UniProtKB/Swiss-Prot annotation:
One of its GO terms (biological process) is negative regulation of innate immune response. PANTHER family: TRAF-TYPE ZINC FINGER DOMAIN-CONTAINING PROTEIN 1, TRAF-TYPE ZINC FINGER PROTEIN-RELATED. The modification N-acetylalanine is found at A2. InterPro entries: Innate_Immune_Apopt_Reg, TRAFD1-XIAF1_Znf, Znf_RING/FYVE/PHD. It holds the Pfam family TRAFD1-XIAF1_ZnF. One of its GO terms (cellular component) is mitochondrion. Residues 454-471, 486-495 have a biased composition (Polar residues). Residues 217-236, 401-582 are annotated as: Disordered. This is TRAF-type zinc finger domain-containing protein 1. Negative feedback regulator that controls excessive innate immune responses. Regulates both Toll-like receptor 4 (TLR4) and DDX58/RIG1-like helicases (RLH) pathways. May inhibit the LTR pathway by direct interaction with TRAF6 and attenuation of NF-kappa-B activation. May negatively regulate the RLH pathway downstream from MAVS and upstream of NF-kappa-B and IRF3. Keywords: Acetylation, Metal-binding, Phosphoprotein, Zinc, Zinc-finger. Interacts with MAVS, TICAM1, TRAF1, TRAF2, TRAF3. Interacts with TRAF6.
Amino acid sequence: MAEFLDDQETRLCDNCKKEIPVFNFTIHEIHCQRNIGMCPTCKEPFPKSDMETHMAAEHCQVTCKCNKKLEKRLLKKHEETECPLRLAVCQHCDLELSILKLKEHEDYCGARTELCGNCGRNVLVKDLKTHPEVCGREGEEKRNEVAIPPNAYDESWGQDGIWIASQLLRQIEALDPPMRLPRRPLRAFESDVFHNRTTNQRNITAQVSIQNNLFEEQERQERNRGQQPPKEGGEESANLDFMLALSLQNEGQASSVAEQDFWRAVCEADQSHGGPRSLSDIKGAADEIMLPCEFCEELYPEELLIDHQTSCNPSRALPSLNTGSSSPRGVEEPDVIFQNFLQQAASNQLDSLMGLSNSHPVEESIIIPCEFCGVQLEEEVLFHHQDQCDQRPATATNHVTEGIPRLDSQPQETSPELPRRRVRHQGDLSSGYLDDTKQETANGPTSCLPPSRPINNMTATYNQLSRSTSGPRPGCQPSSPCVPKLSNSDSQDIQGRNRDSQNGAIAPGHVSVIRPPQNLYPENIVPSFSPGPSGRYGASGRSEGGRNSRVTPAAANYRSRTAKAKPSKQQGAGDAEEEEEE
């Protein structure tokens, strides 16, 4: 029976997509098409009566706690494997956290330390699982690590310290004093090159210890040279090692001894390891492009040529000689200026070479030459150096004050109306008249005549004043003669006295007395204000006529003589106005 069932043939149902036996296929097909339907979403057969329940239970959209929308039948799998907010356990402290915060927590939690009970060392929590494998072995390794023998140390230093020696060689190559400067100026610069060394660093005991260390260094290098196999360029590296050790040992040495030992060692090293070899041969050993300096004609690498020419240029080193500007501190000799320049260059470069300065390496800062003396300085120090540089020219004067003209240099402008006013106001007192009056009052005391003194001398005084004011005076414009205005009684007395003087001579006992200037007013003064209405003139004329009617005949005669003299004055004033208008 089982064999019969296995050997029977099957057919695929078009509705439910299942294999149906052939002998039962017809009945299944009729039942399947009537009662069973295919789910359009999951392509699974379900009874048509349960299709709505299946769609609501399996294929409806739900939202996860991570705000992701998906079908309900996939929610469980998403929460277990894909949701970022699912809970996970920390591998160090067994604390449940979300996946988003788990990594940050594990990094912090694993960085804690716990004391190991076996070796007594503090071990990181994240290394506790692997620590038992290495527990107790680290102490044995440290005990096995003995101090490095001097030979091994020298070998490692000789291989790894070539870079340091090359840096020292570059500084020596960039240094001009070993090749160009004589030894005498360098020795003259002892006090300035090492000016920052204290007296405690210049004692004799330091020199002895440094020399002993130097000899030990030489013996050790000779020992290493004999033990190491000969290789190409060995002598060069040994020479560089010797120079580096020498520069390091010279720190804190006295200025004169350090300078002499340094240059002597450099010369001896060149003679012993290369014979007549010079620094130019060392420069060419690196197969670099060498170009000559246009000032000193020495060969320098291409990348160092610009910096060297900037410092080697005599026009930059001696700016005061080229521009002709005078320094406010006095004009110095060219030799003195050049020596100052060499002194600054030697002090800056020797300090960096001998290790006496705590400045940073050249590679870490920008080196810019001073625009006055040409000395190369760091960018941070350049501003302060140029402010106090000896070669700095005099500060220019303020041009603002120069542009303002002086008051005394401006031409005095005179109004064109002034001469015309002077001509019109013929009654104005001239400056000459006032000066004469002041001089006469200063020469003799002025006092009023007493009542008992006869007024016989008034005529002489009046004539003298009229003569002094009528004459031309240099530097002053001519003014019309001023006639003193007297009262009626005085005029009568004067007229009577003149008549008496014609008949007889003046009494010798009388002295001419000048009245004060306040009592002498010109009679023909013209007011500067505009005249009033005609009515006022009419009234004044009537009143004046009334007053004139009461004047005595003597006073009238005196005024008539004065009126006769006025037309000539007015005629002269009119001529002056015509000349000014032309």
